[in-house]
From Swiss-Prot:
Catalytic activity, reaction form: epsilon-(gamma-L-glutamyl)-L-lysine = 5-oxo-L-proline + L-lysine
Keyword Lyase attributed: yes
Protein name: Gamma-glutamylaminecyclotransferase
Any Gene Ontology CC annotation: cytosol
Entry's Gene Ontology molecular function annotations: gamma-glutamylaminecyclotransferase activity
Assigned keywords, A-Z: Lyase
Name of the gene encoding the protein in the UniProt record: Ggact
Active site (record annotation): E82 (proton acceptor)
Quaternary structure note: Monomer.
Length: 149
């Protein structure tokens, strides 16, 4: 089992969360809420208003999200779903635990895999940086789901 940190459309209440619930993809168990220990730019970009965590540690904000425990089958599914390694890259980072469900929490922080990108258009650096993504947020950039494209 591995921990993953989701900050965008895979979070509860967001457009792609349904894939986290579909056990045909593998197992994903919600463990808690957290935020990245390091700051990163989280931008909304492209014609489909996709949230992107730019792999630029030290810039932007500590990004809020959710921590899941996933099995190997779900991890492989998510790699494919996130277009890893061409669109996003899966890297490990420390996540500060804000809330944990169940006994035996990991302590102050936990190492998680996250899908971020080091390949992006230069103008993305000038987009607004977000702390907490919500497709319906005040930014007005509603995510366009794959099934609508």
């Amino acid at each position: 089992m591995a921990h993953i940190f989701v900050y965008g459309t895979l979070k509860r209440g967001q457009p792609n969360h349904k894939v986290m619930l579909d056990q045909s993809h593998g197992l994903a168990t919600f463990r808690g809420r957290g935020c990245t220990v390091e700051s990163f730019p989280l931008v909304i970009a492209g014609e489909h208003n996709i949230p992107w965590l730019l792999h630029l540690p030290g810039k932007g904000h500590c990004v809020a999200g959710e921590i899941y425990e996933v099995d190997e089958q779900m991890l492989r599914f998510l790699d494919d779903f996130e277009g890893c390694p061409s669109m996003y890259q899966r890297t490990a980072l420390q996540v500060r635990v804000l809330e944990w469900e169940g006994a035996g929490g990991p302590g102050d922080s936990v190492q998680c895999f996250v899908y971020s990108t080091a390949t992006y258009a230069p103008e993305w650096l000038f987009l607004p940086y977000h702390k907490n993504y919500d497709s319906e947020g005040p930014h007005g950039l509603r995510y366009n789901p794959r099934e609508n494209r």
